[in-house]
């Protein structure tokens, strides 16, 4: 997020964003890793694919989540390509990294932040499922409140006085589509070579909703 600094240079903004992300991750007691790719200039490179492959193998990730391939933000779309490429080779021993190959290809899921349209405004494939997140919205709010620099950026860049309010409204809009207060949306990656077992859907069955 180094390009998104308001009143701070790129290096200082990177430090701020990194610390904000670390604090947000700590709410979930999760590890945070930054691969130091430059904000706004992200490219799908061998180096980044291998870095993601290393992390997947280090944590023996069974489930991987990333952006949509038709996300509104170009960096997000590139991230999706990198993550997909790294995930599909998780079991291949010839990938030139030190971590041993995994026994099974992780499940891959995509999610969307605010809208169900592509970069030119066309409707995208409807979500495969929604998850009722009302019971964890307080946790989401706690995590988001650490991202103060993002709120500041949106006030200047998009004239949004309450960016986090827009995020919460997006959850409410998704919830309205399936009859709950707040929801998140997900798509399972069903391309060739990927596992297609609905593990997340089964594990969260109590909270999964469909928009029929």
Mark where each language-model region is.
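Metal-dependent de-N-acetylase/amidase catalytic core
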Residues: 43-212
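Short, surface-exposed alpha-helical segments at coil->helix boundaries
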Residues: 14-22, 80
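Short, conserved catalytic or adaptor-binding loops enriched in Gly and charged residues
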Residues: 23-27, 100-103
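A generic structural signal for short
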Residues: 9-10, 40-41, 156
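ATP-dependent adenylation/pyrophosphate-handling site
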Residues: 1-12
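A conserved beta-strand->alpha-helix junction
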Residues: 25-40
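Glycine/small-residue-rich loop that forms an oxyanion/phosphate-binding "nest" at active or ligand-binding sites
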Residues: 17, 41-43
């Amino acid at each position: 997020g180094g390009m998104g600094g308001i009143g701070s240079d790129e290096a200082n903004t990177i430090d701020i964003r990194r610390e904000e992300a670390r604090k947000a991750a700590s709410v979930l007691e999760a590890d945070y890793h930054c691969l130091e790719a430059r904000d706004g200039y992200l490219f799908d490179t061998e180096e980044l694919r291998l870095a993601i492959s290393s992390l997947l193998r280090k944590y023996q990730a069974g489930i991987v989540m990333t952006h949509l391939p038709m996300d509104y933000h170009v960096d997000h779309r590139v991230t999706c390509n990198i993550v997909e490429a790294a995930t599909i080779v998780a079991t291949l021993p010839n990938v030139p990294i030190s971590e041993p190959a995994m026994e099974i290809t992780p499940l891959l899921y995509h999610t969307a932040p605010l809208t169900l349209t592509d970069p030119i405004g066309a409707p995208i494939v409807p979500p495969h499922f929604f998850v009722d997140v009302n019971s964890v919205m307080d946790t989401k709010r706690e995590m988001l409140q650490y991202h103060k620099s993002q709120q500041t950026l949106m006030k200047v860049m998009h004239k949004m006085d309450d960016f986090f309010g827009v995020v919460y409204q997006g959850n409410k809009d998704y919830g309205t589509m399936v009859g709950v207060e707040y929801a998140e949306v997900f798509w399972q990656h069903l391309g060739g070579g990927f596992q297609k077992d609905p593990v997340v859907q089964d594990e969260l069955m109590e909270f999964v909703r469909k928009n029929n």
